[in-house]
Amino acid sequence: MNARIVVAGASMAGLRAAEQLRAAGWTGAITLVGDEPHMPYNRPPLSKEVLAGKAPFESLAFRPRASVSDVEWRLRRRVVSAALDERTVRLDDGSVLSYDALVVATGMRPRRLDCPGPLAGRHTVRTLDDAQGLREELTRPGARVVVVGAGFIGCEVAATAVGLGVAEVTVVDPLPLPMAGPLGELLGRALLARHEDRGVRFALGVGVAGFTGEDRVTGVMLSDGSVVPADVVVESVGSVANTEWLDGNGLDLRDGVLTDELLRVGSRPEVVAVGDVARFPNARYDGVPRRVEHWSIPTDSAKHAAKALMRHLCGEQAELTPFAPLPTFWSDQHDFRLQSFGAPVLGKDDVRVLDGDPDGDVLVGYHRDGRLVGVVALGGQAVAASAARYRTELLKQPALTV
């Protein structure tokens, strides 16, 4: 039997894993399994350009490199179980795939609100089909939109809805400020002011108790007893890792798949995890395992995991350095951009303005024990470029020990 690597998950992380395995010298078979009907595509535009009707699928689709032209694609298929001791996975059509190595790239799915009320009119944004369905509702005349969750996706959806001409857009969140969790108070206040200036309403410091309506949602009941009228609800309340198929294999599946510093899973050198499903210790920081849902992680983790797999499959003895990525993300909202490098969440207790003013374009630094651990720019292209100049400084820093 020919040697084969199975990649469970045909998203960006899965595609990059296949490409990096070829780049690292793997000449055996590669099978990618994905539950969507589409080839891998870029997800960040879903809550922005796709919702706004400015990005057809052709502009989102990744073009696989020639090196993976012989990869076997099993789309519209889902991995439902794994027997790691036997090195097999079972798909939802009953077929069983054996493997010499396994790449876990099954990603996340949106968390749903467990509240009473109708389901019709309630949406999430994770897939192309999600975004296209939501766009149809946002463009209905007179639609009133409530976004539950003031994180990155929630704020992007709210901004896009305003840009489409939706008259009533309300964002609900139990925290006192938008994006307070990852970015802290200073930028949270700046973002709140910018969104309100552009017509977004906020109900902060309250949760969702349920939904009104019979066949379709007509309002959102808040924990303080008030009701916000709504024809469309977008639930942006976090993610759940797609790891149920790995149950029964003795793995730590709390909040993703726990890996070691080389992205190997469960002391099994033939199994690695990549993308936002991987909960890994970042050697650049404090070594505490965390998932990272930023744009740069699929490619960075795929490259490192491919080297770890090839080392095992080829019997190489060369030492590999621990995975130590510098997380990078951006978020376009209205006419401004958030650009981040590093790990701001680790430095929220010591936030300093490095340049500009929170009332305008601003560059903010996040520090831990006096050391810069992340920078975030809010504003136009010039301040985003200023943030990029700090990337080199962040990359040069030694590991943070706590």
What are these regions, as identified by a protein language model?
Residues 381-399:
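A short, polar/charged loop-to-alpha-helix boundary motif
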Residues 2-3, 279-382:
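Mid-to-C-terminal Rossmann-like scaffold of FAD/NAD(P)H-dependent oxidoreductases
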Residues 27, 73-90, 97, 164-261:
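A Rossmann-like FAD-binding core segment of flavoenzymes
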Residues 133-183, 187:
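Rossmann-like NAD(P)H-binding beta-loop-alpha module
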Residues 9-12, 126, 149-151:
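Glycine-rich Rossmann-fold phosphate-binding loop(s) that bind the pyrophosphate
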Residues 120-141, 215-221, 226-304:
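FAD-site-proximal beta/loop scaffold in flavoenzymes
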Residues 2-72, 160-182:
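Beta1-alpha1 glycine-rich phosphate/pyrophosphate-binding loop at the start
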Residues 1-6, 62-145, 221-223, 232-236, ...:
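FAD-binding core/adjacent interface of flavoenzyme oxidoreductases
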